[in-house]
Amino acid sequence: MSGIKRTIKETDPDYEDVSVALPNKRHKAIENSARDAAVQKIETIIKEQFALEMKNKEHEIEVIDQRLIEARRMMDKLRACIVANYYASAGLLKVSEGSKTCDTMVFNHPAIKKFLESPSRSSSPANQRAETPSANHSESDSLSQHNDFLSDKDNNSNMDIEERLSNNMEQRPSRNTGRDTSRITGSHKTEQRNADLTDETSRLFVKKTIVVGNVSKYIPPDKREENDQSTHKWMVYVRGSRREPSINHFVKKVWFFLHPSYKPNDLVEVREPPFHLTRRGWGEFPVRVQVHFKDSQNKRIDIIHNLKLDRTYTGLQTLGAETVVDVELHRHSLGEDCIYPQSSESDISDAPPSLPLTIPAPVKASSPIKQSHEPVPDTSVEKGFPASTEAERHTPFYALPSSLERTPTKMTTSQKVTFCSHGNSAFQPIASSCKIVPQSQVPNPESPGKSFQPITMSCKIVSGSPISTPSPSPLPRTPTSTPVHVKQGTAGSVINNPYVIMDKQPGQVIGATTPSTGSPTNKISTASQVSQGTGSPVPKIHGSSFVTSTVKQEDSLFASMPPLCPIGSHPKVQSPKPITGGLGAFTKVIIKQEPGEAPHVPATGAASQSPLPQYVTVKGGHMIAVSPQKQVITPGEGIAQSAKVQPSKVVGVPVGSALPSTVKQAVAISGGQILVAKASSSVSKAVGPKQVVTQGVAKAIVSGGGGTIVAQPVQTLTKAQVTAAGPQKSGSQGSVMATLQLPATNLANLANLPPGTKLYLTTNSKNPSGKGKLLLIPQGAILRATNNANLQSGSAASGGSGAGGGGGGGGGGGSGSGGGGSTGGGGGTAGGGTQSTAGPGGISQHLTYTSYILKQTPQGTFLVGQPSPQTSGKQLTTGSVVQGTLGVSTSSAQGQQTLKVISGQKTTLFTQAAHGGQASLMKISDSTLKTVPATSQLSKPGTTMLRVAGGVITTATSPAVALSANGPAQQSEGMAPVSSSTVSSVTKTSGQQQVCVSQATVGTCKAATPTVVSATSLVPTPNPISGKATVSGLLKIHSSQSSPQQAVLTIPSQLKPLSVNTSGGVQTILMPVNKVVQSFSTSKPPAILPVAAPTPVVPSSAPAAVAKVKTEPETPGPSCLSQEGQTAVKTEESSELGNYVIKIDHLETIQQLLTAVVKKIPLITAKSEDASCFSAKSVEQYYGWNIGKRRAAEWQRAMTMRKVLQEILEKNPRFHHLTPLKTKHIAHWCRCHGYTPPDPESLRNDGDSIEDVLTQIDSEPECPSSFSSADNLCRKLEDLQQFQKREPENEEEVDILSLSEPVKINIKKEQEEKQEEVKFYLPPTPGSEFIGDVTQKIGITLQPVALHRNVYASVVEDMILKATEQLVNDILRQALAVGYQTASHNRIPKEITVSNIHQAICNIPFLDFLTNKHMGILNEDQ
C-alpha cells in the first residue's frame, strides 16, 4: 500500500477526537457530582437513623439491667429462705432423735455435699454415666429433650460400660465374639440383653453422631500475599455431637477430598485428632469427607459437606455450615476394640484363657441383604462346619496375646483385619494356619478412589482355593489395612488370627480365611456323595489346608466348603496321615483391591479335581510335599453362588490303583514368595477384567521324595474369568504386566501345588502404574504333568467347563515334566495340559532367570516370557514370547516328549524329556551368534524342539532318529536351522489328547525375504473331553540382532473351519513367522503385541483327522479371528514409484530424498487419495490401535519408502553414489523426524531418574557460541580508509550555465471504450491474508494472479505461506531429531530446547542465512 500515497480523509482525525472528548468530560463531571450528592444524602440519613436507634437501644438496656437487679434480689431472698427452712427442719429432727446420733453430714446442704463426699459413694446411674469416657453426656442431657434422653438412657449406660472396659484394655485389639451374635462379653451379657429389649438397635450397634462443619474468615485484600489471591481462610472439622465431642476412640483417620483446583493436593489425610483441615480458597465447593473407623468392620463413610465461606466479609471467624450424620457402629468396635475375655466359657478349650476374644461380630451391611442375625444356636450345621468339637469351631478366632504384645508399635497403623461372623453373614471361615506379618504401607496420596495400595500379608501354605462371593461386602473399603502379626505356635495347637481381605468394592467379599487348630483329630470323614457331586461336601478343617468356603447370595443355605483334606470315605483313598513337622514356610500374599462391581458369577457348581489324590504336608522348613495319596477336591471360583459343589469327574477315576504309594510328589519352595491367596472376584469381573497382580522372586528347589518330580495339574479356579472378561483396556488401568523373575525350576515346582492353589505375583515393574499390582496366575497358566500312570483324559476337566475355567485361562509359562519353564498352556486342565512323568533326576538344577509377563487378555491369563532387560513393563515389543503347549504325549506312561522353551535374558533354553525320562537342557545364546553344536542330548530320538534363533522359529518333531542325523544344529544370524524331517510322529492313545507339532521345512533365508512359516497339526482325541476349550498359544519373537524383525502370531482365517466348539478339546499352536512382511495385528489389549484368540477346537465329529494348518503371513483385521485380506508387498516387477509423483530435480542428499518421499507416503492422513493401506485417518485413530498394529503400520510405511527410494536411486544415475537405507533405518528416521507419532506408553514415565538427567547432560552437544569477533571487518574497514587517503583530492568548481527542459508534446487520443468484464476474486485464506498484511507493512503489494480468465486468487501469498511452513517444519523436525540423539535410552525427548533448534539450523546447510556464518565477510571473500 505504501507504494501509493494514502488518500487524505475529509476531516482531520485529531479534530474529531477533540470534539468527541468534550461532551464526555462534561458527562463525567455531572455524573461524579450527582454521585457525591447522593452519597452525602445517604450518609446523613444513615447517621440520623443510627443515632435514633442507639438511643432506643441504650434505653432498652437500662430497663433490662434494672429488671435483672430486681430479679437477683428476689433470688437471694428466696435462697436465704430455703436454706433457713432446710436447717430449721433438719435441726428439729436431729434434736428429737438425740444428739448422739447426730450425723454431721446432715448439716451439709445438698449443694455442697457432692464436693465433700468420697467418690466411692456416687453409685447412681447418672453419676456413673458422668464418669465414663464420654464424660460430656451431662451437657447433652440438659440440651436434649427429655423424652429423647430417657429413651437413650439405658443403652447409654451400657455403652459406657463397654467403653470403659475397652479403655482399660487399650493394648489388646480384639473383636467381640461373633459366633453367637447376641452375645456380648460374659460379664455384661445380661445387662446387655435387657438393654436390647428396650431398644432394638442397641444390641449390635451404637448410634454415633458425626458432625462435619466449617468455619471461615475473610482475608482483606491488604493482608493477602501477592501470589496468593485467596479470599478466605477456612477450616473443616470433624467432631462428635455435643454429647460426645471426641470421636478419636472410633475414628482412625479422615480423608478430605477437596476441589480439583487444589490438585495435586486435593486429597488430604488426617490421621490424628483433632480432625481439622485448614486451607485458603476463593470459592465454595462440596467437600467429600471420608471417615475411616478403627474397626475395619465398620464401613468407611463418605459425608458430603458443602463448604460455606463468610459472606459478611467482616474478617472475623464465622461458622459456615454443619452437616450432621448419624452412624451405626458395632458395639464391640468402640473404644480400643477390646472386651474382657471372661466369657471364654467352654468354647475355648484349646486356647489359653487369657486370650482376648477375636471373634468378630456380624456386620450390618448397608445393602440389599440385611443380615438378620438371630442368635445362632450351637448346631454347627448352620455354620457350614462339620459337627465337630466346640474347640475346633472357635479356636480359629483367638489370637495369641504374646504376638500382639510383640508388635505394639505396628498396632496403630495395622488395623486388625478381621473376619465376619459366620452366622448368616457374608462369609464363613476358611481354616488355615497363616502367618500374617504387618507391612505398613503408606497410602497412595493420589485419589484413593482410583488407586489403592494392596494389603500385604504372608501366608503359610500354598494351597487352598479362594472364594469370591458376590454378596455385598460388609467390610469397609480400607485401602491400607495391614494384618496383625501373629506368632506361630507348634503344629499341634496352632491358633491364629483370622484375617479377611477386603476388596474395596462394597459389593464384594474376596475371601476370608481363618486358621484352625492343627490337631489332626478333627478330620471327619465325609459321605461318598461328595464324589458324586450330589450333596454338598462337608468341609474339613485341617491345620495345613485352606478350606474354601463359598457363599450363596440372599440365601440362608451355605455352600459348604469342599475338603482339601483327605475325604475319608472315598472308596479308593488311603487313610489320612497327620501333618509332620512344624509349619514353617513363609509365603507372601498381596491382594490388590480393585475398584469395580461384583460380577454375578454364573452358578455352575463344579469342583475341579486333581487327577491324583494329594495330601499336603508342610514340613518344618520350606517344604510342601504333595503325596499322591489323598483325594483333594476344590471348587472352582464359579461356585461362588451355588449351594452344591459338584466335583466334575470324581467318579470312575482309578485313584492310586496303578500308583506305587512310594512315589510322592514334592514341591519345595525355599524361602520363595510363591503366592497363594483368595481370588478376588474382580478377577472374574464381567465389566472390565481388572486383574489382581504380582511379585515375587520365587526361588524353588525341588527335592523329590522318591526322586521323582512330577508336576501337578493346577486347576484354574477363575470360572468366570475367561468367559466374562471383556477386552482389557490399555492405559493406566489396563492389564499391567508384571515382570516375574522365575528360575526355570520354579515353574516346575509351582505346578506341583494342589489344585485350588491360586498363585499371585506382585509386580516389580519400573513404571509406576505397574507397581504393587497383583496378577493372579490361573493354574492353567502353569503346565502340569502328573505322575499318574493311567493318564485319565477327563479327570481334570476343570470345573466342568474348560471354557470357563482353565480353558480360557490356559497358555502359560508353566512347567511340564522336564522342569524348565515350559510355555504350556494346557487349558488349565490335566487333560489339556500335557500329562507326563519324568524319570529320576527329572529336573535340572540349572536356574535360568527369565522374566515372564503375565498377560491378561479376554481369552485368559498368559505368562509371556520377556527376556530383554530394557523393556519396561508396558512396551513389550522386544520381549520374546513363546507360548503354547508344545507337548507331544506318548502312549507310554514312562516317558513323554515335552518341549520347553525358556526365553532367558538373551538366551534360549531348550529342555526336552526323552523317552528315558531324562530332561536335557541346552542353552543357546541368542546374542552371541555363534554356531552352537547341538549336544547329543538334543539329537535324542523323539525329542520335540522349538528353536528360537534370531527371530526365526523352527519347530521340528522327528520320528525316532531323524533328528540325530541332522548333526549339530547351526544357528547363525538371521538364519533358521534347516531340519531334514517334516514328519511328525503322532501317537494316538485313546482318551488322551495329543498335540503334535509338525514343521514346515525352511531353507536358510536372508533377512530380507519372508522366512519361516511353521505349521502345527492338531490331533483331536478319539473320545474328546466335553466342555473343554483351550487357548491357542501366543508367539512373539523379537530378534535381539540389529534388524528389528518380529514374528507375530496371527490366527489365520484358515482356522475358521475348526470352529470354536467345546465338544473336543485340542490345543492349536500356530506360529507364522514373518520377517519382511509385517502382520498387522489388532487385538484389544494394546500393551502387548501378540494377539490371543479364542481357542480353535477341532470338532469331535472327525476325531482322528489331522488338521494341518499352514499359516501364511497375513494381516488380521480388527477381530482376532477374521482376516481382512492379505497385504503382501511384491518385490517383483511392479513399480512402486508409479504410484507416487516425486520431483527429484532439486534434491541432492539422501535426507532430502527421504523428506520428499515421506511426504508422499504419510502414516496419518485425512485425505483419502494419499491414504495407503496402512495409514490412519487421524492421530486419534492411530493411537486407538494397539502397539502391534501401530508398529506394523510404521514398518509397512518404512518398507514402501525404502522401495520407492531404491527405485529412485536406481533410475537416476546422479544418485548412484548414495547407499540405499535399510527399512529399520528408515523407520527410525521417520520416528526421529516426527513423521511417526510417539508411543503414548513411552510418554508416561514422568520422573526421569538422576541417571537419565546425567546422561542427558553428558550427551548434550557443545553448542558453538553464536558470538563472533568483528576483527576481520575492522581490519578491512581500516584498509579501505588507508586506500581512500592515498587518492588525490581534486575539487574543481563548475558553473552551470543553463537548464533546458525537453518539450513534451501532448497528443490527445480518444479513449476506446471497451467493455469492463466482471472479475472474480477467490477469497483468500486467513493465512494468505496475514501474509498480505505483513508484506504491505514492508511496502510490497502482492497482486492477485489470474488462475483462469477473469478468475483471480492470492497465489503468491499461498506460496509464501507454504514455503514458510515447510521451512519451519524442516527446522522443527531436524530439532526433534537432534533431541532424539541427546535423549537417553532411545526415549522420546520431553521437549525441544533452544539448543536443539540452534543445532538443527546449523545442521541444515541451506539455513546458513540464519546463522552467523557469513557475518562480517564480504562477498568476494567467499
UniProtKB/Swiss-Prot annotation:
Cross-link (Glycyl lysine isopeptide (Lys-Gly) (interchain with G-Cter in SUMO2)) at residue(s): K9, K113, K189, K370, K487, K552, K592, K649, K773, K923, K1110, K1130, K1222, K1285
Keywords: Coiled coil, Epilepsy, Isopeptide bond, Nucleus, Phosphoprotein, Ubl conjugation
CDD domains named in the record: YEATS_YEATS2_like
Keyword Metal-binding: no
Effect of Y313A: Reduced binding to histone H3 crotonylated at 'Lys-27' (H3K27cr)
InterPro entries: YEAST_sf, YEATS, YEATS2_3HBD, YEATS_dom
Name of protein: YEATS domain-containing protein 2
Biological process according to GO: chromatin remodeling; negative regulation of transcription by RNA polymerase II; regulation of cell cycle; regulation of cell division; regulation of DNA-templated transcription; regulation of embryonic development; regulation of transcription by RNA polymerase II
Effect of F285A: Strongly reduced binding to histone H3 crotonylated at 'Lys-27' (H3K27cr)
Organism: Homo sapiens
Region (Disordered): 117-198, 465-486, 513-540, 794-842
Disease link: Epilepsy, familial adult myoclonic, 4: A form of familial myoclonic epilepsy, a neurologic disorder characterized by cortical hand tremors, myoclonic jerks and occasional generalized or focal seizures with a non-progressive or very slowly progressive disease course. Usually, myoclonic tremor is the presenting symptom, characterized by tremulous finger movements and myoclonic jerks of the limbs increased by action and posture. In a minority of patients, seizures are the presenting symptom. Some patients exhibit mild cognitive impairment. FAME4 inheritance is autosomal dominant.
Role: Chromatin reader component of the ATAC complex, a complex with histone acetyltransferase activity on histones H3 and H4. YEATS2 specifically recognizes and binds histone H3 crotonylated at 'Lys-27' (H3K27cr). Crotonylation marks active promoters and enhancers and confers resistance to transcriptional repressors.
Modified-residue entries (Phosphoserine), positions: S118, S120, S157, S447, S463, S465, S471, S473, S536, S575, S627
Localization in the cell: Nucleus
Taxonomic path: Eukaryota, Metazoa, Chordata, Craniata, Vertebrata
